[in-house]
UniProtKB/Swiss-Prot annotation:
<dbReference type="InterPro" id="IPR004750">
    <property type="entry name" value="Sugar_efflux"/>
</dbReference>
<feature type="transmembrane region" description="Helical">
    <location>
        <begin position="51"/>
        <end position="71"/>
    </location>
</feature>
<feature type="transmembrane region" description="Helical">
    <location>
        <begin position="13"/>
        <end position="33"/>
    </location>
</feature>
<dbReference type="GO" id="GO:0015767">
    <property type="term" value="P:lactose transport"/>
</dbReference>
<comment type="similarity">
    <text>Belongs to the major facilitator superfamily. Set transporter family.</text>
</comment>
<protein>
    <recommendedName>
        <fullName>Sugar efflux transporter B</fullName>
    </recommendedName>
</protein>
<dbReference type="InterPro" id="IPR020846">
    <property type="entry name" value="MFS_dom"/>
</dbReference>
<keyword id="KW-0762">Sugar transport</keyword>
<keyword id="KW-0812">Transmembrane</keyword>
<dbReference type="GO" id="GO:0007059">
    <property type="term" value="P:chromosome segregation"/>
</dbReference>
<keyword id="KW-1133">Transmembrane helix</keyword>
<feature type="transmembrane region" description="Helical">
    <location>
        <begin position="82"/>
        <end position="102"/>
    </location>
</feature>
<keyword id="KW-0472">Membrane</keyword>
<dbReference type="GO" id="GO:0005886">
    <property type="term" value="C:plasma membrane"/>
</dbReference>
<feature type="transmembrane region" description="Helical">
    <location>
        <begin position="106"/>
        <end position="126"/>
    </location>
</feature>
<keyword id="KW-1003">Cell membrane</keyword>
<feature type="transmembrane region" description="Helical">
    <location>
        <begin position="366"/>
        <end position="386"/>
    </location>
</feature>
Length: 393
């Protein structure tokens, strides 16, 4: 046998691909262990008032946008995302440690959130590195990215129930230290197994920006994804309160609905990735938006647990395609700027949270929880109009 080099290369590539999948899951689980219980942590442990809890989420989103955009531009210019991801994981460990033992609201907001923003940036930087690796090795980027996104969805199927079990069964300290362990393992995996692809500095200096011909479409896609994520954030904020206070259904139904949707998102992402080249990203995003319109129309009319659970298939189509294709759409509109493109996509979710937090509170205060879904519907209809004007790539 004289084919050992080829076999070795294949094994090396498989090991790298497997490492990417594990890192995607770990970055997802680190976030899924913290986010679902944050409002309870702030209320019960930090003793923050409801308005301060809302301000904490808004402040987190704003700081996260500033940090992630700074790191994205720096990584696209100077390269070697591997070292940056390890650095972000280290700061993520420090953030989790601070949340585990500190109960001062302002320390957590300004120091904890700042450190957490670096930790959460490990995820988009990992996706950017994966895209560059796929392009360099000739791997199908769409399917590879879809598998990685599916790992994050899997983390969100497992993470929230585990977070509640750790926080309520043991303590928030145990929960945050578990998230710190996830960051540690993630950093070690990145350092040992992910490729290091340094960029050569260009001779000409200047700022990296989207190609002129794509700037309009990039801005339009930012608006589209922000509206879609914003409507989803409205749903996440409003749905549990709507289920409990207006439909008077069991509290656990909200958790079952979220878990069902997250589980259904995984095959949706993989199917969307498989058909992306054949059908086009714009067409798939339109399918997602139509699914969103049907989903929110159903939420406006549904009253029984069976129908609410059945609607999660439409929710999975909506979020599964957005989560799997939206990021790739940005990357294709911004060639050579994988970090900026991926972070720009990630920040559409953060801006969506800022919008949703304000809208949900005001609408529910003036009218009721049911009315919030009308605003989500309006946002999705606006998305459909925007999708008629964007070009395919």
């Amino acid at each position: 046998m004289h084919n050992s080099p080829a076999v070795s290369s294949a094994k090396s590539f498989d090991l790298t691909s497997t490492a990417f999948l594990i890192v995607a899951f770990l970055t997802g689980i680190a976030g899924a262990l913290q986010t679902p219980t944050l409002s309870i942590f702030l209320t019960d442990e930090v003793h923050a008032r409801p308005a301060m809890v809302g301000f904490f989420f808004t402040g987190s989103a704003v700081i996260g946008i500033l940090v992630s955009q700074f790191l994205a531009g720096r990584s696209d210019k100077r390269g070697d995302r591997k070292s940056l991801i390890v650095f972000c994981c280290l700061l993520g460990v420090l953030a989790c440690t601070l949340f585990a033992w500190n109960r001062n609201y302002f320390v957590l907001l300004f120091v904890g959130v700042f450190l957490s923003s670096f930790g959460s940036t490990a995820n988009p930087q990992m996706f950017a590195l994966a895209r560059e690796h796929a392009d360099k090795t000739g791997r199908e980027a769409v399917m590879f990215s879809s598998f990685l996104r599916a790992q994050v969805s899997l983390a969100w199927v497992i993470g929230p129930p585990l977070a509640y079990a750790l926080a309520m069964g043991f303590s928030f300290t145990v929960m945050y230290l578990s998230a710190a362990v996830a960051f540690i393992v993630c950093g070690v995996m990145v350092w040992l197994f992910l490729p290091s692809m340094r960029k050569e500095l260009p001779l000409a200096t200047g700022t990296i920006e989207a190609p002129r011909r794509n700037r309009r479409d990039t801005l339009l896609l930012f608006v589209i994804c922000t509206l879609m994520w914003g409507s989803n954030s409205l749903y996440i904020i409003n749905m549990p309160l709507f289920i409990i206070n207006e439909l008077h259904l069991p509290e656990k139904l909200a958790g079952v609905m979220m878990g069902t949707a997250a589980g259904l998102e995984i095959p949706t992402m993989l199917i969307a990735g498989y058909f992306a080249k054949r059908l086009g990203k714009r067409f798939l995003m339109r399918v997602a938006a139509v699914g969103g319109v049907c989903f929110y129309a159903g939420m406006l009319m549904a009253h029984s647990p069976v129908i609410l659970l059945g609607l999660q298939l439409l929710n999975a189509i909506f979020i599964g395609i957005l989560g799997g294709i939206g990021m790739l759409y940005f990357q294709d509109l911004m060639p050579g700027q994988a970090g900026s493109a991926t972070t720009l996509y990630t920040n559409t979710s953060r801006v969506g949270w800022i919008i949703a937090g304000s809208v949900a509170g005001i609408v529910a205060e003036i009218w009721n929880y049911h009315a919030v879904f009308w605003f989500a519907m309006v946002m999705i209809i606006a998305t459909l109009f925007c999708l008629l004007r964007i070009k395919d790539v």
